Amino acid sequence: MDITVNKANSLKGEIEIPADKSITHRAFMFSALTKGKCKITNYSKGADCLSTLKIIQQLGCEIEYINDKELIIDAKNALKAPIESLNCGNSGTTTRLISGILAGQNFTSNLFGDESLSKRPMKRVITPLEQMGAKFIHNDYKLPIEIKGTQLNGIDYISPLSSAQVKSCLLLAGLNANGTTSLNISNLCISSIASS
């Protein structure tokens, strides 16, 4: 199955999401990449998702809490260099997905996490991001890591494992890359994205 995503001229509307951790991480991150405001309803308030929310705030997004189920993320049109290191807490999803976004920015970011997260492997996203041109400083592919944002180039990546985090990371990176980024698993094209 081939899926190609091209940039739309305009995207408007409302989506009500279930209180799902995986969807919430991605909703927060995609909202951070928009030009304008996004309202998110019924988001997960788990610690991992709150780590993602805190990080996008540190990157310049403004968060307005409407009530206990709704918030608005105002991305202010562009991410900004963080003043402090970004704390991913215990969230591997936060670390891997935000790496895809940060790799294509025009600033340097530092990611760290708790003791448990600092033992978990990040090679599965660092390797393909480096193939796209990203620059990392790390200790054996583990946190803490420094990401030196740069202009990325699209790649055709054959993944040795099926991982939603790797797919999401590379598709997020592909949004800021020159050309087309394709992710293949077992020679089956799962996803591709072309930036403009």
Briefly describe each language-model feature range:
Residues 1-196:
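Structural preference for solvent-exposed beta-strand-turn elements
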